[in-house]
Amino acid sequence: MIQIDFEKMGGLVPAIIQDYQTNEVLMVAFIDEKALKLTLETGKTWLFSRSRNKHWMKGEQSGNTQEVQEVYTDCDADALVIKVKQNGGAACHTGNRSCFYVRWEDGAWVEHSEPLFDPDEVYKK
């Protein structure tokens, strides 16, 4: 039986979050054993924040939740691909659909999308 190797990176594995219909990469984050268990049990994307040292459900503040459709691991069982239905349009905390909206072009990084929401309004502290 395949077991995810959480030991290789100190209890975490990278998780590539991808749109299940278009295969667009929405974000990359880290997941630990508890977050994976919550993801599989609830059908929502749960991640582990290294900066806040806590578990969080994607969309818990913005409302832009993700409904898990499929979960894959790689051949070494040390990385995940989580295919989701993205609710609310934006997966990125900047308000963009994807966290990968900046492209290298002619020697500079160039933004290639407009935010779908204002993060200052959504994440008021």
Swiss-Prot record:
Keywords: Amino-acid biosynthesis, Cytoplasm, Histidine biosynthesis, Hydrolase, Magnesium, Metal-binding, Zinc. Its cofactor is Mg(2+); Zn(2+). Mg(2+) binds at D74, D76, D78. Its main location: cytoplasm. It catalyses: 1-(5-phospho-beta-D-ribosyl)-5'-AMP + H2O = 1-(5-phospho-beta-D-ribosyl)-5-[(5-phospho-beta-D-ribosylamino)methylideneamino]imidazole-4-carboxamide. GO terms for biological process: L-histidine biosynthetic process. The keyword Zinc applies. GO terms for molecular function: magnesium ion binding; phosphoribosyl-AMP cyclohydrolase activity; zinc ion binding. Its EC number is 3.5.4.19. It is found in: Cytoplasm. Coiled coil: none annotated. Pathway: Amino-acid biosynthesis; L-histidine biosynthesis; L-histidine from 5-phospho-alpha-D-ribose 1-diphosphate: step 3/9. Gene3D superfamilies: Phosphoribosyl-AMP cyclohydrolase. Belongs to the PRA-CH family. HAMAP family: HisI. Catalyzes the hydrolysis of the adenine ring of phosphoribosyl-AMP. This is Phosphoribosyl-AMP cyclohydrolase. The gene is hisI.
